[in-house]
């Protein structure tokens, strides 16, 4: 009992200090502070006056003063009724509920300035994020303004003027420089391509279709199949067999002479 009264008194003192003047004592609820219910009613009255003095912004419903129905519901909900007095088990819970209500009212009285600052900071941060997002979308896509001037690639001229920039020359002089360049003649290019074409034609005549015989999916020539072991008797060389017969005949002749 004493603990709850001290909690209520502390909350009332904080509210009076926050208000800055003795307007809370003018209420009829604050004249009699002998019971917990009167202290709770006084704290709620002071809290309602403080919230009524704070500016009301759209979208900040928690900063608006509570309605009369909400006040009555809070008073009837947290008040220790006759049912709580009759039941021994609910007495402690009603006291704890009263203390929690006083603490919640105390925190609510202290919260509005901080909540207002947090709301302002959150609104400023959200606005900054929206601006950053908009600037990114405007600069990132084609219809937005580019970040900076695009750098043009450096042009290199083969006639020794690469040290000087191309912007130093007007358009006519640049055309003259390009006309003075020694490009290979078309006849020389055709001759080089003609030599390559002759080599390709010889390869095609030698191995048949170049595309069919050059890649893996084409059949290899007969002389290269299986390493040359699958040749016919006519295609194989007859020299080893003839050399063998010759050696046998010579050996037989030497043996006959020795006999």
From Swiss-Prot:
One of its GO terms (biological process) is neuropeptide signaling pathway. Specific enzymatic cleavages at paired basic residues yield the different active peptides. It comes from the Eukaryota. Keywords: Amidation, Cleavage on pair of basic residues, Disulfide bond, Endorphin, Hormone, Pyrrolidone carboxylic acid, Secreted, Signal. It holds the Pfam family NPP. The modification Pyrrolidone carboxylic acid is found at residue 23. Residues 113-142 are annotated as: Disordered. Disulfide bonds join 24-46, 30-42. Residues 128-142 have a biased composition (Basic and acidic residues). GO terms for molecular function: hormone activity. The modification Valine amide is found at residue 147. Residues 1-22 form the signal peptide. GO terms for cellular component: extracellular region. Belongs to the POMC family. This is Pro-opiomelanocortin.
């Amino acid at each position: 009992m004493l603990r709850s009264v001290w909690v209520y008194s502390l909350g009332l003192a904080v509210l009076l200090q926050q208000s800055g003047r003795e307007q809370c004592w003018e209420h009829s609820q604050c004249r009699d502070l002998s019971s917990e219910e009167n202290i709770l009613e006084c704290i709620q009255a002071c809290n309602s006056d403080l919230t009524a003095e704070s500016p009301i912004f759209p979208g900040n419903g928690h900063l608006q003063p509570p309605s009369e129905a909400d006040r009555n519901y809070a008073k009837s909900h947290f008040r220790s009724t006759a049912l709580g007095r009759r039941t021994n088990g609910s007495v402690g819970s009603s006291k704890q509920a009263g203390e929690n209500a006083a603490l919640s009212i105390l925190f609510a009285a202290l919260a509005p300035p901080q909540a207002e600052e947090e709301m302002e900071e959150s609104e400023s941060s959200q606005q900054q994020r929206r601006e950053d997002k908009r600037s990114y979308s405007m600069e990132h896509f084609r219809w937005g303004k580019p970040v900076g001037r695009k750098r043009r690639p450096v042009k290199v001229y083969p006639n020794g003027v690469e040290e000087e920039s191309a912007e130093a020359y007007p358009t006519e002089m640049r055309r003259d420089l390009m006309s003075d360049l020694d490009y290979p003649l078309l006849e020389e290019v055709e001759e080089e391509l003609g030599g390559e074409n002759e080599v390709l034609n010889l390869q095609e005549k030698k191995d048949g279709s170049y595309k069919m015989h050059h890649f893996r999916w084409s059949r290899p020539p007969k002389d290269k199949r299986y390493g040359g072991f699958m040749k016919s008797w006519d295609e194989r060389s007859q020299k080893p067999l003839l050399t063998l017969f010759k050696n046998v005949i010579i050996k037989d002749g030497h043996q006959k002479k020795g006999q």
